[in-house]
């Protein structure tokens, strides 16, 4: 992990989990959340907002911030879906996509993404190649009935 999250939200995530949700996403883009861009690569901040806009506009995905990998997954989600992703944080988007298609309960809580005071993002532009198939999966394959 990049050690770049507000871990104070873990108790709130767990509370949502105890209410029956299978995935609880920390969202920087929902009301009460905050996405500090000052030390993030400019292209990354544009991509985060673009992907979120597209998925919100064309799907019923229950998170406004699908690119944030800070999530709580239920044991059922982890056991049901073998992880195929081999690079970086792609597994978080993969599990979200598969759970969405299988009608697992997904919710989000607001989270602030603090300004990075040390280190740098592990985001690589080449990672987009690995994220893209899962975003397309969400767009192309609606939840099963």
Residue spans of the language-model regions?
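Phosphate/oxyanion-binding loops and surfaces in catalytic or ligand/nucleic-acid-binding neighborhoods
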Residues: 57, 102, 139
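Residues at the C-termini of beta-strands that transition into short coil/loop
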Residues: 27, 99, 110
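Acidic donor-binding loop at a coil-to-helix junction in glycosyltransferase catalytic cores
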Residues: 89-95
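Hydrophobic residues within well-ordered alpha-helices
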Residues: 17, 99-100
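Catalytic beta-strand/loop signature of glycosyltransferases that borders the donor
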Residues: 63-65, 103-113
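The conserved acidic donor/metal-binding loop of glycosyltransferases
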Residues: 1-4
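Acceptor/aglycone-binding surface of glycosyltransferases and processive sugar-polymer synthases
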Residues: 7-89, 115-126, 130-135
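A charged, well-structured terminal subsegment
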Residues: 143-144
């Amino acid at each position: 992990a990049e050690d770049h999250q507000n871990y104070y939200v873990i108790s709130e995530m767990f509370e949502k989990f105890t209410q029956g949700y299978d995935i609880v996403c920390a969202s920087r883009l929902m009301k009460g959340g905050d996405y500090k861009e000052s030390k993030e690569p400019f292209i990354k901040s544009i991509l985060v907002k673009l992907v979120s806009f597209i998925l919100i506009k064309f799907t019923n995905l229950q998170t406004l911030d699908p690119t944030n990998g800070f999530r709580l997954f239920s044991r059922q989600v982890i056991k049901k879906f073998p992880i195929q992703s081999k690079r970086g944080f792609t597994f978080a988007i993969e599990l979200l996509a598969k759970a969405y298609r299988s009608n697992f309960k997904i919710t989000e809580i607001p989270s602030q993404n603090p300004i990075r005071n040390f280190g740098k993002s592990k985001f690589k532009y080449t990672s987009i190649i690995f994220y893209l198939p899962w975003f397309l999966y969400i767009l192309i394959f609606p939840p099963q009935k």
